[in-house]
């Protein structure tokens, strides 16, 4: 039997529909909640996390009003496995119960939410809140997915990446070719050619910054706020696929970070070793990503400004985070490769703003993960979880009311990752290809100790096995 079949899907709850009304009297610290998910946002690309060359004034200002978690990590990677833990508060890793769906990515954990698992939005709806969802993350709406379950109002902003929205018959092959790197074979770039063809078909009619994906998402989110001013209580989830690639922000953002570049506009990375890029091309690709980050920051800021104007932040818990980062050549890789679980992929921002201002401007070093967010939201809004949660209340963690974790674990495809107070470790699920770093002495994870510290490697792998409840699937 495949190890992936050994363990039933986690969670307890009704098999269908929104759960019965549970405690939702508002006895928590907030009446409403907004969760902003910004896909592929590296923590180290924000000023509030120490970056000194990328402009992120909105998130930096928000950090001054929020509790900032300095050691926040995904529970599962990439997009949809991470969303499952975010939407349910239950662990998705180690991906034991998984069947690939036709027409979707064949990655462990990339699947719909099991019927027996209750989402945070179902719990909120069952407690009488108006639940609202806005996103351009097109994976949510593939035929096999069901993540909009429990939202009473939702909107899909079309056109990001490979969303089959625009007609590819309108795209010229030579326009696609100009976006492809030189020196790679046709077989190597074929998937990029398909993706970029659809991208150009989707984005061909942009005329101003407002027509780009993140601006469209946040403009629509503003309209949703305006439409729902009269509701008694609400839960809003804004899921922006930006700053996910392709990276082609308006030119003014690119000029901030790489003025005068004259080479090819390589807006889509080829996943794998980064040495196919020249030094100038790699620098420019990093500038493209930085430009996307600054654009997303601007529109998040405009959205929050509108929420303030409408008085809809006054009694609202606000959380901003990301699902994972992106490799940009730091360890010789570019993309989101599951074999490279270094800081550039694993460190994510996590800002939690209480409406009463408690903890504003503080930094919390306790480990936090994305599946902590549902427990945090439900506790803050006085909604009883419909089932036991795997995550913990981040506000209680920040206040010292609960013991911090001694370590955290996560997984991506057939690789798993663990961090404790001293070390970070990752390897294949079968223990092959181990990497080990001592974080205080080596925060950039440049000096691999796995070969010389075999005892520590074994200890860290045992922590993974304990968290997984047994052998890891291979």
Task: Give the label of every model feature segment.
Residues 1-474:
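Catalytic domains that recognize anionic headgroups
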